[in-house]
Amino acid sequence: MVIMSEDASVPAPSAAQPRPLRVGFYDIERTLGKGNFAVVKLARHRVTKTQVAIKIIDKTRLDPSNLEKIYREVQIMKLLNHPHIIKLYQVMETKDMLYIVTEFAKNGEMFDHLTSNGHLSESEARKKFWQILSAVEYCHSHHIVHRDLKTENLLLDANMNIKLADFGFGNFYKSGEPLSTWCGSPPYAAPEVFEGKEYEGPHLDIWSLGVVLYVLVCGSLPFDGPNLPTLRQRVLEGRFRIPYFMSEDCETLIRRMLVVDPTKRITISQIKQHKWMQADPSLRQQQSLSFSMQNYNSNLGDYNEQVLGIMQTLGIDRQRTVESLQNSSYNHFAAIYYLLLERLKEYRSSQLSSRPATGRQQRPRSSEISNAEMPQDSLTSETLRSSLLYQQPQSLIQPSLQAEMDCDMNNPLQPVFFPVDPNFNGLFRNRSISPSSLLETTISEEVRQEKELEDEIKAYDHPIRIPSNTSRRHTLAEVTTHFYQHAPPCIVISSSASPTEGTSSDSCLTSSSNDSSVALSSCLAGQVMTGSPATARMTSAFLASQSDAPVLQVQGCMGGASLLPVSFQEGRRASDTSLTQGLKAFRQQLRKNARAKGFLGLNKIKGFARQVCQSSSSRAARSAMSPFQHAQPNTCIYSSSGSSREGRNLLEEVLQQQRMLQLQHHQLLQPACPQTSQTSATNGLPPSDSAGTCKASNSLLLSELQRENSFELAFGGNSQLLQPHFFGVSVSPVSSAAHLLDTHLYISSNVSPVGTTFSQQQSFSAQSPSYDAVTLQHGDCEMEDLTSNQLGKFVLVK
């Protein structure tokens, strides 16, 4: 008996958006990966709301040997129950298709993590290797050999814990009965496999463990080559390089695992007792504790009564569930049991982790506090049951994913069918409601306020949201890779006062139209908090045209793997890949474009632009309250009242000054006196009026420019802006740099009747008025405090 996956009773969210495809009780969300005869989909269980990975296999494309291998993989996964091994939840089979529902690891492969972030520290590698070793030892204790251990098959869950996956090459073994199948990945394969000899399964896995540990610590492969014969020769020789940063204990452990003779190779028990592994004794205790917490050995009759009670409350027959667990049926009953058990563990761990309040966490409700204080055995099922009835948004699946799903597997999923047990109608016999009403899971007002499940929904809408307690270093390429199917990133560029803040802020990534305004508002709010009133928004197309970094070339038609060109086959360090270099090049390119091309020291004006943009609003408010400012006319563009600079931007004024400073590089200097009179005449003011205006204005001294002694400039709060004729005479860039090195800043306490003079060293000087002590005290608080002998001229060195 089969039924169509699309349920007509569930209304579509909109007329334009197609309904989500379903396989049994699972709503298909997106594609995780594709193969020659299989495709892996990300799905969500409709009852437990748990994300799972469904491997959909087209049996018509498999020969009998490969089909036997698939069945053996399912048989192996049914026997394995370990915290660091991917769990099997359900197996569904039709005439042509096979659906394998397994645990979903949210953080992907260890290979991608190393490619993005570089090699691990030895302490972090030790923690990960303990988890890997525990999983492999568990397999060997059940007489199962993996035979394909590599970083691509080591997945990372939401807590960055190891999950061993892909038992496609796994097999059962007996002690003393060697295996002979050539399988696995060549860089991780043992010498006996390259030689075509029979081998012991555990010895093969130990060699692969040595290669995995080397990759974790070094970020590259110990054995590599341009072709298979070269790689084979290097593996048979057993020679590899040890980097300078690897400790001696780690080196000895890897060398004992990578021994060419399998009989002399170290065993798992000896690995656990090695000095490098025992450097942190707490890790071994954590492994034993985490393994003891796995409390479902269902086929042995060890059931979780609390989970069974929750299922019975939901209307699922308890007796049918127990029978499915005893027979290892892995049907809908067993899948709901296993998924509910995982949800219960997550709920308990979240209650424990939410006890220490943080700045981002909201105050828990009284019911949550009471549940957290209760023992685990006495935890009621009402809270978890209500969370299971939380309604998911109907617009979870993007139209592009739906279109992609329509063409997968040469239409084996059109329409998608799933098998149903003949006695399935007794599943909800203890409930007065219909199955469709249970699947629709109506929302109650109490459940709407469950913050944990709201966070879970937000985590799905933004799958790469980085928690604050993690140490992962996500690059811009990784962000772009995960969102190539959604809206392009909106990158906000602002004038920051601190150079350490970088040039670009975090990307405002939106995955749906409902969240776009919220994400954009939060990003802009973050810019306002940094004190940047003027921000320049740049689209992804502009970034792609301005930056040479290939990582910014967003290609929506390509998958995530296309943006990770670096592989261990190329023999490069993961930390030295183009991902990190691309991000650095992007920031350097933006800084380079923001700099002025010309005289030495012109780039210092960028610091002035940032300082003006950051503190203009606060300084204007303080200047408006100053009695000195009230007594002055609004005649300059930097006046606090802003009457003469309406419609003009501060940043534009600074850029205008940059252009003025680069004019007339070939003219000779003229005498100081004619230039002074010309300056006053050009401004339309007589010399006396010019001097009087300068006396009445205050100035802003940039201490940063004075310290560098490269470009001295004094701007008054109400002083006149330097005009282009100020720079009518100049010298070449080379000669100006030479004069700059010999120039001494000239500050005099004498009051000068003119506004600008020229020194005899061919350096341009702008003269500012003197101030008395009372006026200086009431001036701008950001003005540098000058002593009595420093009041007077301000020299502009060019």
UniProtKB/Swiss-Prot annotation:
GO biological process annotation, one example: microtubule cytoskeleton organization
**Superkingdom of this entry's organism?**
Eukaryota
Per the record, residues carrying Phosphothreonine are: T181
Tell me which UniProt keywords the record has, alphabetically: ATP-binding, Cytoplasm, Kinase, Magnesium, Metal-binding, Nucleotide-binding, Phosphoprotein, Serine/threonine-protein kinase, Transferase
Q: Which reaction does it catalyse?
A: L-seryl-[protein] + ATP = O-phospho-L-seryl-[protein] + ADP + H(+); L-threonyl-[protein] + ATP = O-phospho-L-threonyl-[protein] + ADP + H(+)
- Quote any Pfam family the record assigns: UBA_SIK3
Q: Which organism is it from?
A: Gallus gallus (Chicken)
| CC terms in the record's Gene Ontology section | cytoplasm
All copies of domain Protein kinase, residue ranges: 26-277
| Activity regulation (record text) | Activated by phosphorylation on Thr-181.
Active site annotation, chain numbering: D148
Task: List residues binding ATP.
Answer: L32, G33, K34, G35, N36, F37, A38, V39, V40, K55
Q: Which parts of the sequence are annotated with region: Disordered?
A: 351-382, 672-691
Q: Where in the cell is it found?
A: Cytoplasm
All residue ranges annotated as the UBA domain in the record: 302-342
- Function summary: Phosphorylates IRS1 in insulin-stimulated adipocytes, potentially modulating the efficiency of insulin signal transduction. Inhibits CREB activity by phosphorylating and repressing the CREB-specific coactivators, CRTC1-3.
Q: Which family does it belong to?
A: Belongs to the protein kinase superfamily. CAMK Ser/Thr protein kinase family. SNF1 subfamily.
Q: How is it modified after translation?
A: Phosphorylated at Thr-181 by STK11/LKB1 in complex with STE20-related adapter-alpha (STRADA) pseudo kinase and CAB39.
List, as start-end ranges, the regions of compositional bias called Polar residues.
351-361, 673-685
Instruction: Tell me the SMART domains matching this sequence.
Output: S_TKc
Q: Does the keyword Acetylation apply?
A: no
Q: What protein name is recorded for this chain?
A: Serine/threonine-protein kinase SIK2
Q: Which GO terms describe its molecular function?
A: ATP binding; magnesium ion binding; protein serine kinase activity; protein serine/threonine kinase activity; tau-protein kinase activity
E.C. number: 2.7.11.1
